[in-house]
Amino acid sequence: MHRRVSRRGTWSVKAATGVVAFTLATLGLSACAPKPIPSPSPTAVAPTPTAVTPSPQPGRPALHITPPDRWINDPQRPFFRDGQWHLYHLYNADYPDGNGTSWYHLTSTDLVHWRDEGVAIEKYRNGLGDIWTGSAVVDTENTAGYGAGAVLALATQQHDGVQVQSLFHSADGGFTFASADGNPVMPNPGVPDFRDPKVFWDAAHSRWVMALAEGDAIGFYTSPDLRAWTYRSRFTTTGLGVLECPDLFPLAVDDDPGEVVWVLMTGANGAAEGFTTGTAAWLGEWDGEAFTSDGDHQWVDAGPDFYAATTWEDPRVSDAEQLQSRYLIGWMNNWNYATDLPAPDWAGGTLSLVRELALRTVDGQPRLVVQPLGGLDALAPADEGPGADVTVTESWEASDPLPDGAYRLRVTVARDDAHPARETRLLLDAGDGSFITVGYDFAGQRVFVARDTDAIAATMPEDYRAIRSAPLAPDDGAVDLDIIVDDTTVEVFAGGGEATLSSVVHTAPGARGWGAASVAGVTRLLDLRVEPLAAAPVQQP
């Protein structure tokens, strides 16, 4: 982690009594609740953000993918063809009155701006049920007989509770698909869970590899032609519930091509660990037929809303560069309250922003780290130099409101040497006296997000109101926070990506105040920047 040091003068802000948009004294986030914190000082000055074009539809995220209406969930791994990325996600056009999902299609040239291309694989068309998660691939070797470079998709179909795998082919480069003859290519062997095929080409063995979710296990299969599949092995888990949406891929540790580790990733249930549903990952070895883990799983994202995640490489870069990092996207929602969220003209949450996933050595061990996509920088104003420095003794209120629409808040949180704080909190106004908290617990060395006081928390299930946190050691007494906020989401990247927390949130219209609190000591906010992000809503055809 690199601490950003400001060259500007610092602002020393002491607590004072004042009228503010939210009440800091209602917090109590630590295991040992602090005494009530006085209201923030109205005299402090924060960096002044410039104007930004808000999301064109009120209530819609400015940056995140949402469906045109009805219901969205699982993203499908994108592929690159003819200068465009092709992304699909599950979509139910009949929600809430009817069931079943199809594959909805979007395209992009930069993984930031997306164009709506409509439904690509329709549900209930081949007599085998609706369309669930799977994989789109480019068959460069013409293994399936549809021509070199044909776009094909393998996806789970479900009818009367029976899950099978079907093959679909596209004659127009992935915009529409037809069901292949002979479906299903993988009939159900008599098990309740048999779903979400993740397929990739194994060049070393000239065959396709599939990872398939099978209850508490991931099954591995190979095929020469995407039709005939041979079982190879199974990786079984304990205490993580029914697995969904697996992924298998290699990454180089610290960009070293001589130290390549395989990653097995899957949607899982962390309730037995005091967590919630999320994305679990194991590091280990893959020999072409079986995966062997080097240890216990880690959670790719410690927030409550990052599920059904998938990764992919950029085929335009070298093999060595493909091992350095991968793109990552997930579904920002949680089945424990997915249907309870407010649904103005669509439901199901959003897809996360595209991220970059890498392996870095942390405390002597390889660990997955997640960073925002570099392309997001193009949405921010030109760099205006170092940010502001603020000293917070108890509480502080920014005099300038947060930008309309999406924004990015970056800061290094440091403890004062003479009077080190136990905990630091950034409080983002959610309106009507409610707020969202992003903070760091220096005593427990954990970064956390709390939305138990956002605009809808009072009516939501307990799993929504639970405070989520991730372990993160400070670097020389400081922690970097990179926070991206959209109309219904907060994504926190801490410590250079060593900890990530993604949350669906809800605010009242016009809620733009914010401040900070320092518990049991003094906090220094270094190089504090608040940048508006230009709106990039899904472009309609």
For each feature predicted by the language model, list its residue ranges:
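Generic N-terminal initiation segments characterized by hydrophobic and/or small/turn-forming residues
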Residues: 19-26, 60, 399, 522, ...
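Beta-rich carbohydrate-recognition and catalytic domains
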Residues: 28, 33-197, 201-244, 252-302, ...
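Beta-rich accessory regions
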Residues: 257, 285-295, 300-308, 313-541
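Secretory targeting and sorting signals
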Residues: 2-43, 48
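Hydrophobic alpha-helical segments with strong N-terminal bias
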Residues: 15-18, 57, 479
